[in-house]
């Protein structure tokens, strides 16, 4: 086995896979350490990819040259466009994934990737010399040397499983946990804290009756995450999900047994996810509600179990069985896998640079749940950035840092390093102040150029993107030039459908600006709209109808970007900046922002503090500020 690498990635989950692939594709000799090769990119919790904000992250990963979007498209059981009745800033794609096939797909990609070696082992310790990571110690005593290390350990750092009053050391699915890395980080002055998450039970399909459940089909449209996907599963071949509601009996069972839950017995000392609470937590927090939604989802086309979305719990197994059998259609349910909660160590992400490198340990990057986030998509996005930046650091290049107006990935990383996390962080559209610019349809326009410049987007795909963009521009040009009279076929059709009544001549673009007009009706009459992808049509409609809002938003961004260009020297002494609030001074010292824009987003730093900082920089670092 080779013992010298450019980059070592510890952990083969969604963050680790993206980090390792990015590094290897950028011509770095890369090792990916994971205990079992058949657990690469496993889905230990929900068998799905995407959702609000998260689905846009998957598109961003694809635009930068990552793999998650392709894997999700290839292994989708159902595809659904969410929030389609609302504004385009919150549209999002979600797929129900075949978790077995997803993992197999990623395993194949990893094993076939040039420059990438998959090592089946456990990393038990980091080798850190003079505040610089130089390698990794494996469980068999083998030492691997490297220039950079990316930690993507998920929920495996000093993890403990909790069910009822039982608590024991283990990773998800009873896999080994890792304690040594936590101790290494602590010795190097890295602040750690404990978070909690959980997973629901899995129920044998043949033991439940879903005849009275509400069917939840996918969306009947050609939808995909990846720019390169051209094959779509027709709606009639997609798998169904189902919706049921818990009963009043379910609520009573939980209320009667609440002290048996690990959450409410004092066993859990860590903080759980606000946006994915345990079922007993829902009963306590929303005590006035008698019932709660529960989604029944397939895990695999070849699988024999349902995933019970929204029903995670840390109750003992005897109480879990009572809870499950109180659900409509689950009176005779048989459990394949019991629910459990899991506690694990995280790094305080305010100790990270925007590149995701730990500030006080050179060449050590972290990504995924170790940074306090939740979700496969958030992890994959961070993993991609960490892998890219580890590679770029070796080459002596500036890191890739995405701004908040460029990507949801940028919003997430900016939130992590400047605001910190006090509970598992979930990406939401409400976290993005520029969400009209960060849409489901325009990830390619925002990031494909960057992916190409970095080297992850190959020439052939880049040429396809240029063609894609040209087709949109040609269509908009034709819409601006072509005119339709009230007696034209299109005008008559629109009137018949009740979408518009043209009283005089209109250009195609003026017609498209009418909110009630469906662009699909216009396609037969506009040659350049024909054969366009769904995303291209979406972009044309949104850019046309929201042009004024988009223009205003871009002007706002231009002003903010100017603040990003006002650099803060690394040797600044914040104690010498007069009239700074005490909290602001403490936070600035801790975060060490690179520029005024970043400083302005730190929790506890107010506009008055920024003015004092600008005044100090002008008087003491005038040359650097020009």
Swiss-Prot record:
Protein purpose: NAD-binding protein involved in the addition of a carboxymethylaminomethyl (cmnm) group at the wobble position (U34) of certain tRNAs, forming tRNA-cmnm(5)s(2)U34.
NCBIfam families: mnmG_gidA (TIGR00136)
Endpoints of the signal sequence: none
Organism: Mesoplasma florum (strain ATCC 33453 / NBRC 100688 / NCTC 11704 / L1)
Binding site for FAD: 11-16
InterPro entries: FAD/NAD-bd_sf, GIDA_C_N, MnmG, MnmG-rel, MnmG-rel_CS, MnmG_C, MnmG_C_subdom, MnmG_C_subdom_sf
Family classification: Belongs to the MnmG family.
Name of the featured protein: tRNA uridine 5-carboxymethylaminomethyl modification enzyme MnmG
Cofactor needs: FAD
Upper taxonomic lineage: Bacteria, Bacillati, Mycoplasmatota, Mollicutes, Entomoplasmatales
Cross-referenced SUPFAM superfamilies: FAD/NAD(P)-binding domain
Gene name of the encoded protein: mnmG
């Amino acid at each position: 086995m080779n013992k010298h690498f450019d980059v070592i990635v510890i952990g083969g989950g969604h963050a680790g896979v993206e980090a390792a692939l990015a590094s290897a594709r950028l011509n770095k000799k890369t090792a990916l350490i994971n205990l079992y090769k058949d657990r690469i990119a496993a889905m230990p919790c929900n068998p799905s990819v995407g959702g609000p904000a998260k689905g846009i992250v998957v598109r961003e990963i694809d635009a930068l040259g990552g793999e998650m979007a392709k894997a999700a498209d290839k292994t989708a059981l159902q595809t659904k466009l969410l929030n389609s009745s609302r504004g385009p800033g919150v549209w999002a794609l979600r797929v129900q994934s075949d978790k077995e096939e997803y993992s197999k797909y990623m395993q194949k990609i990893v094993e076939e990737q040039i420059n990438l070696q998959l090592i089946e082992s456990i990393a038990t310790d980091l080798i850190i010399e003079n505040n610089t990571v130089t390698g990794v110690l494996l469980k068999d005593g083998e030492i691997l040397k490297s220039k950079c290390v990316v930690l993507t350990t998920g929920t495996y750092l000093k993890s403990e499983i909790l069910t009822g009053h039982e608590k024991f050391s283990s990773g998800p699915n009873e896999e080994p946990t890792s304690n040594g890395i936590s101790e290494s980080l602590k010795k190097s002055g890295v602040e750690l804290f404990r978070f909690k998450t959980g997973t629901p039970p899995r129920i044998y399909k043949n033991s439940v009756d879903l005849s009275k459940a509400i069917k939840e089909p996918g969306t009947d449209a050609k939808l995909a995450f990846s720019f390169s996907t051209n094959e779509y599963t027709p709606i009639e071949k997609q798998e169904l999900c189902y919706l049921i509601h818990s009963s009043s009996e379910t609520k009573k069972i939980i209320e009667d047994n609440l002290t048996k839950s690990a959450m409410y017995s004092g066993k859990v000392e860590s903080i759980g996810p606000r946006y994915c609470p345990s079922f007993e937590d829902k009963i306590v927090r929303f005590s006035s509600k008698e019932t709660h939604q529960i989604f029944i989802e397939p895990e695999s086309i070849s699988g024999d179990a349902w995933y019970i979305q929204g029903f995670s719990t840390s109750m003992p197994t005897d109480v879990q069985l009572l809870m499950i059998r109180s659900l409509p259609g689950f009176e005779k349910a048989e459990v394949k896998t019991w629910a459990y909660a899991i506690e694990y160590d995280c790094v305080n992400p305010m100790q990270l640079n925007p590149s995701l490198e730990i500030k006080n340990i050179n060449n050590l990057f972290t990504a995924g749940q170790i940074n306090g986030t939740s979700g496969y998509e958030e992890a994959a996005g961070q993993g991609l950035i960490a892998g890219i930046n580890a590679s770029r650091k070796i080459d002596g290049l500036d890191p890739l840092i995405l701004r908040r107006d460029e990507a949801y990935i940028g919003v997430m990383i900016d939130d992590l390093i400047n605001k910190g996390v006090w509970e598992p962080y979930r990406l939401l559209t409400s976290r993005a102040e520029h969400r009209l610019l960060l849409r489901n349809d325009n990830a390619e326009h925002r990031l494909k150029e960057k992916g190409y410049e970095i080297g992850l987007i190959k020439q052939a795909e880049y040429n396809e993107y240029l063609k894609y963009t040209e087709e949109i521009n040609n269509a908009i040009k034709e819409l601006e030039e072509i005119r339709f009279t009230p007696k034209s076929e299109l005008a008559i059709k629109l009137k018949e459908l009740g979408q518009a009544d043209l009283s005089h001549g209109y250009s195609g673009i003026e017609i498209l600006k009418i909110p009630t007009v469906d662009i699909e009706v216009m396609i037969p009459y506009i040659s350049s709209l024909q054969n366009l992808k769904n995303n291209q049509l979406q972009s044309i409609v949104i850019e046309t109808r929201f042009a004024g809002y988009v223009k205003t938003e871009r002007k706002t961004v231009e002003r903010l970007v100017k603040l990003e260009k006002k650099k803060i020297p690394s040797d600044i002494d914040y104690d010498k900046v007069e009239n700074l609030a005490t909290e602001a001074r403490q936070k600035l010292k801790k975060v060490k922002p690179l520029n005024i824009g970043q400083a302005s987003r730190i929790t506890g730093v107010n506009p008055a503090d920024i003015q004092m900082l600008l005044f100090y920089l002008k008087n003491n670092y005038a040359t650097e500020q020009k």
